[in-house]
Amino acid sequence: MYDISGWKHVFKLDPNKELSDEHLEMICESGTDAVIVGGSDGVTIDNVLHMLVSIRRYAVPCVLEVSDVEAITPGFDFYYIPSVLNSRKVEWVTGVHHEALKEFGDIMDWDEIFMEGYCVLNPEAKVAQLTDAKCDVTEDDVIAYARLADKLLRLPIFYLEYSGTYGDVELVKNVKAELKQAKLYYGGGISNAEQAKEMAQHADTVVVGNIIYDDIKAALKTVKAVKGE
């Protein structure tokens, strides 16, 4: 079994986006610590299964970030369950999770499941609109969400999600200083190795996503920038 606490760099692949076999091989053989499969819309059991089968040809750890209960399938190493802490809708905080546990609770392998406390900070992002996230927040608000995830809920992951735009480095630094046991994931707007390296100075894990589909070479360079290998 893999130890997620040591992951510094992960790629996130959207099953609803096209990725060539050649580029998928580059991603999986890049030296990244893991590949997360997940997206905000258009995620189906069919495209998740296709992605799973494709990634399983390689040795890289594979995680399903669950956004739709209907798209859950066995075969992944881990399952990340996001709870959007700054959502205005309870369904995205605990509601969907409650329904999933009613249906699948008896057969879930709890050693494979990790809850993520999300704080979504880009109002233009699909995930913000889908979950009705309250993005007009102060730094004090974000710090409070971090404390909620880390100290009250004892979640293993606190995820700062800027999805599509590069985030506030100083805020990421200050959030990291607040966390005692939760790992800080950062995702959003990383388009080059320099940005990835900058965020890696503060976040425990840097998530690289959209740039995979825009500039595969730039995406691959983020691995070494983050891991320093």
Swiss-Prot record:
Pathway annotation from the record: Membrane lipid metabolism; glycerophospholipid metabolism
EC number of this enzyme: 2.5.1.n9
Keyword Oxidoreductase: no
The UniProt record lists the keyword Cell cycle: no
Record-level GO BP terms: glycerophospholipid biosynthetic process
The family this protein is said to belong to: Belongs to the GGGP/HepGP synthase family. Group I subfamily.
Protein name: Heptaprenylglyceryl phosphate synthase
Pfam family, one: PcrB
Cofactors required: Mg(2+)
GO MF entries: heptaprenylglyceryl phosphate synthase activity; magnesium ion binding; prenyltransferase activity
Sorted UniProt keywords: Lipid biosynthesis, Lipid metabolism, Magnesium, Metal-binding, Phospholipid biosynthesis, Phospholipid metabolism, Transferase
Superkingdom: Bacteria
Binding site for Mg(2+): D14, S40
Reactions catalysed, as given in the entry: sn-glycerol 1-phosphate + all-trans-heptaprenyl diphosphate = 3-heptaprenyl-sn-glycero-1-phosphate + diphosphate
UniProt-listed PANTHER family: HEPTAPRENYLGLYCERYL PHOSPHATE SYNTHASE, PTHR40029
